[in-house]
Design a protein with these regions (language model features):
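NAD(P)-dependent short-chain dehydrogenase/reductase
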Residues: 124-133, 157-216
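Active-site helix of classical SDR
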Residues: 147, 151
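Rossmann-fold NAD(P)-dependent oxidoreductase module
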Residues: 17, 21, 103, 158
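N-terminal Rossmann/SDR dinucleotide-binding element
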Residues: 1-76
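Conserved Rossmann-fold NAD(P)-dependent oxidoreductase catalytic core, especially the SDR/UDP-sugar
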Residues: 98-146, 171
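NAD(P)H-binding glycine-rich loop region in Rossmannoid oxidoreductase-like domains
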Residues: 54-93, 103-106, 123-124
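Structural signature of the Rossmann-like NAD(P)-dependent dehydrogenase/reductase core
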Residues: 8, 72, 111-116, 171-177, ...
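Residues at the starts of beta-strands that form the adenosine-phosphate
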Residues: 4, 28, 110-111, 169
Length: 216
């Protein structure tokens, strides 16, 4: 039987690559994203493409109509510049994961993947230069540096509780600075690797010998 997957946030950078990979392995893919289709990073004609606001439970129900596995990469986010200036907006993404989990459980979906972030780690652990490699348990005691990190950490816990209470097969992955083909490189939503590459190219074109780098 052909697997049927929902890629929530599939119009975004990582979601677009995931949808392409799933389609390439013969999976029947539904892509749901809030952006108009002409703003999707990649659009796959073989997928069932839906423009939906997944903060709405009814939209989640529609997106899940033909799915038996969920990949949730949907959220309102960007680079640190975007996160710092849109803290409340980033927190709204908790509605997406809450509604998707609830609807998935009610519709009998057993497999659920949640895209978390390294932003869940405490602020003080990100300011120490002599720190050893982070472990999963280093997320606690919890003190993420911003609303985006708190939203991700809460959503991780919610996923865990759905595993404990309903037996759903839940997996969580904490992404860091992701970049590559089709990635954002300007406009404030880009991550550090892409932003630094852009600044270097712009500096060379402008004859400048300096670029601005955030953090220390």
């Amino acid at each position: 039987m052909t697997q049927r997957a929902l890629v929530a946030g599939g119009g975004g950078f990582i979601g677009g690559h995931l949808a392409a990979e799933l389609l390439g392995t013969g999976v029947d893919v539904t892509v749901a994203d809030i952006k108009p289709e002409d703003q999707w990073y990649q659009r796959h004609p073989r997928a069932r493409n839906l423009v939906l606001d997944l903060e709405d439970p009814a939209a989640c129900q529609e997106a899940l109509a033909e799915a038996d596995v969920v990949y949730n990469l949907a959220c309102n986010m960007g680079g640190m510049g975007f996160i710092e200036n849109n803290r409340a907006l980033c927190m709204n993404s908790v509605l997406i994961n809450t509604n998707l989990l609830k609807q998935a459980q009610q519709q009998g979906v057993q497999k659920y993947f949640y895209a978390s972030s390294a932003c869940i780690y405490p602020d003080y652990r990100q300011g120490e230069t002599d720190l050893v490699a982070l472990k999963e348990s280093d997320a606690y005691p919890a003190m993420p540096e911003d609303g985006y990190g708190w939203e991700k950490l809460f959503s991780e816990r919610l996923c865990r509780h759905y595993l404990e209470d309903f037996g759903m097969q839940v997996r969580v992955f904490r992404f860091h600075n992701v970049y590559g083909p089709f990635g954002t490189w300007d406009g404030g939503r880009e991550k550090a690797p892409a932003a630094i590459c852009r600044k270097i190219i712009e500096a060379e074109r402008n004859g400048s010998y300096e670029i601005e780098v955030w953090g220390d």
